[in-house]
């Protein structure tokens, strides 16, 4: 089938030769992909990989899949075929996919050394995002959403009301990342929040905070194009490059108490945002790291936390419930459909996905949020 695939380190290109998926276990579903967003993880896989993808000549530890594999994990689509034990969806349903693989999926891969092994402790406790065997559809486990079709277990399928357009539905995955993070932080309705960075994850964090009833949201960002994007979402923007060493003091003063924010979310992952995420908090405030950091350590003063009983935590990925809650939030208007559409800065066919998708994002990072690719199964590019 047609796909934009990862062949080896530094080689992503369109092909007609990715095998079409087949149902192999009774609980699997085949989806005709409508839209799939390009994620920062996809870019990192090209620039720095293989990270999640198997190395050239090797197989993935979970599924035994080998390259080439279609990329893409932020997908929406229409159910094309269901296994005999599938009860969650039917042919023709609109759906999104929780692309994370865990112990719950080991039954799908009889050639894996982990086949039908006992679930890890994290999975037994319901934290599948922390699974010992964690992996992602479209990032090495099996081929993903930059293809005509994808196959996944019904456990990972989330039905989407047809009132939600399928291009907007493709944003449910990145929104679920930030929904999970805001839940992890213990966010309470009516609280104030600081978002550090207005890239794709920062902007998704804004939408989630608005949906959860934040009383005040301030976004700290220095790039003018991203500042404009954040303003379009109706939040206050602070540019720390204009205030130097007084930035934290000024930020704290922007809250109703003039004493700092109840919650902060680091979506940038650099030393200055790490420090700000803690120091801009009020007493008993919570700082949550969503950013993916490199291996370099950063200085940390424990008394920044201890003296005012602040909390520092982190969040990774999502679970199925996050997807279900995001879909409900969009459907009932807590997350505005028009706000979601603001995040879509490009749409391309998978045939053009490398030049007009990946290269566009790498060359013009600050002027793009989310570029969606489609195999055009149902005339999506009309």
Curated annotation (Swiss-Prot):
Catalysed reaction equations from the record: (R,R)-butane-2,3-diol + NAD(+) = (R)-acetoin + NADH + H(+)
Residues modified as Phosphoserine: 63
Location in the cell: Cytoplasm
Co-factor remark: Binds 2 Zn(2+) ions per subunit.
One Pfam family, short name: ADH_N
Residues holding Zn(2+) 1: 39, 73, 173
Required cofactor(s): Zn(2+)
GO annotation terms (biological process): alcohol metabolic process; butanediol biosynthetic process
Keywords of the record: Cytoplasm, Metal-binding, NAD, Oxidoreductase, Phosphoprotein, Zinc
UniProt keyword annotation of NAD present: yes
Binding site for Zn(2+) 2: 103, 120, 123, 131
Subunit field text: Homodimer.
Family per record: Belongs to the zinc-containing alcohol dehydrogenase family.
Other observations noted: Present with 8730 molecules/cell in log phase SD medium.
Name the record gives this protein: (R,R)-butanediol dehydrogenase
Provenance organism: Saccharomyces cerevisiae (strain ATCC 204508 / S288c) (Baker's yeast)
Taxonomic lineage: Eukaryota, Fungi, Dikarya, Ascomycota, Saccharomycotina
Gene: BDH1
């Amino acid at each position: 089938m047609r796909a934009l695939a990862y062949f080896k380190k530094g080689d992503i290109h369109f092909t007609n030769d990715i095998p079409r998926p087949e149902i192999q276990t009774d609980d699997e579903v085949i989806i005709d992909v409508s839209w799939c967003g390009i994620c920062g993880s996809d870019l990192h896989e090209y620039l720095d990989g293989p990270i999640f993808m198997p190395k050239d000549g090797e197989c993935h530890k979970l599924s035994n899949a080998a390259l080439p594999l279609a990329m893409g994990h932020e997908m929406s689509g229409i159910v094309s075929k269901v296994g005999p034990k599938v009860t969650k969806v039917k042919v023709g349903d609109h759906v999104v996919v929780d692309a994370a693989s865990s112990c719950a999926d080991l039954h799908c891969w009889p050639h894996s050394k982990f086949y039908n092994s006992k679930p890890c402790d994290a999975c037994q406790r319901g934290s599948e995002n922390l699974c010992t065997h964690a992996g992602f559809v479209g990032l090495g486990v099996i081929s993903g959403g930059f293809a005509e079709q994808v196959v996944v277990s019904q456990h990972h399928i989330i039905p989407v009301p047809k009132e939600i357009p399928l291009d907007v539905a493709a944003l449910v995955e990145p929104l679920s990342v930030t929904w999970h993070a805001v839940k992890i932080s213990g966010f309470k309705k009516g609280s104030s929040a600081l978002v550090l960075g207005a890239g794709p994850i920062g902007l998704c964090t804004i939408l989630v905070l608005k949906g959860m009833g934040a009383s005040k949201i301030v976004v700290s960002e220095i790039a003018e194009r991203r500042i404009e994007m954040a303003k379009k979402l109706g939040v206050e923007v602070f540019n720390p490059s204009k205030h130097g060493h007084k930035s934290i003091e000024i930020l704290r003063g922007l809250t109703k108490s003039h004493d700092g924010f109840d919650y902060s979310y680091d979506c940038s992952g650099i030393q200055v945002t790490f420090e700000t995420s803690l120091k801009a908090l009020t007493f008993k405030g919570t700082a949550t790291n969503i950013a993916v950091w490199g291996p370099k350590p950063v200085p940390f003063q424990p008394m920044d936390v201890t003296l005012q009983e602040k909390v520092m935590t982190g969040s990774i990925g999502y679970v199925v419930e996050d997807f279900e809650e995001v879909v409900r939030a969009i459907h009932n208007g807590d997350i505005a459909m028009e706000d979601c559409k603001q995040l879509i800065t490009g749409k391309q066919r998978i045939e053009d996905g490398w030049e007009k998708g990946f290269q566009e994002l790498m060359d013009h990072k600050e002027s793009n949020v989310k570029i969606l690719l489609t195999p055009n199964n149902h005339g999506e590019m009309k």
